[in-house]
């Protein structure tokens, strides 16, 4: 099964010049979604981790399914002002602007070894911010996995420069 067949590109979304990959067809197809989680799990097994951090918002989908499949804890990194309790925050640059991520202070145990997960690796900014966020809060980051890496944006090189070990199911 070629999972890229279930990730059609949408040109100029959310801004001109961006090719957005729509995950809706992949999620709507039970066999494709099951295969996606199996392949993410195969990558995750190469890391030593106790918890998964899903990055808003599509990282929530893959991260929660993978955490359930792998019997691991799950936490979320959200956009600003979405969490009800005290949180840690990190600002970062995007392919098309800037934003911030937050995690709730009480979500993860102090000895957590965290695997980051998101749907797409573009420039690496989001995963680098999540890594910095967790490390500044005192957690160990085991690495990062994504469903798709957009190779021309050189995100994997940026992750390497920041000492973040990354693996992706697909590259385009």
UniProtKB/Swiss-Prot annotation:
Listed GO CC annotations: cytoplasm
Role noted for this protein: Catalyzes a salvage reaction resulting in the formation of AMP, that is energically less costly than de novo synthesis.
Pathway assigned in UniProt: Purine metabolism; AMP biosynthesis via salvage pathway; AMP from adenine: step 1/1
EC number: 2.4.2.7
Keywords: Cytoplasm, Glycosyltransferase, Purine salvage, Transferase
Protein name according to UniProt: Adenine phosphoribosyltransferase
Protein origin, superkingdom: Bacteria
Principal EC category: transferase
Cell compartment(s), UniProt: Cytoplasm
Species annotation: Polynucleobacter asymbioticus (strain DSM 18221 / CIP 109841 / QLW-P1DMWA-1)
Molecular function (Gene Ontology), one example: adenine phosphoribosyltransferase activity
Oligomeric and partner information: Homodimer.
GO terms, biological process: adenine salvage; AMP salvage; purine ribonucleoside salvage
């Amino acid at each position: 099964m070629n999972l890229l067949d279930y990730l059609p590109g949408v040109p100029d979304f959310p801004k001109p010049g961006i090719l957005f990959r729509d995950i809706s067809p992949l999620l709507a197809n039970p066999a494709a979604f099951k295969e996606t989680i199996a392949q993410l799990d195969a990558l995750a097994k190469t890391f030593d981790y106790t918890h998964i951090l899903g990055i808003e918002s599509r990282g929530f989908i893959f991260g929660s399914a993978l955490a359930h499949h792998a019997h691991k804890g799950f936490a979320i990194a959200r956009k600003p002002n979405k969490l009800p309790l005290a949180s840690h925050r990190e600002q970062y640059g995007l392919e098309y602007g800037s934003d911030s991520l937050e995690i709730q202070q009480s979500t993860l145990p102090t000895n957590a070894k965290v695997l980051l997960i998101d749907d797409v690796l573009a420039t690496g900014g989001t995963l680098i911010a999540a890594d910095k966020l967790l490390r500044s809060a005192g957690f160990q980051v085991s690495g990062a996995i994504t469903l798709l890496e957009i190779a021309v944006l050189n995100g994997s090189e940026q992750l390497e420069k920041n000492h973040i070990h990354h693996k992706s199911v697909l590259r385009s």
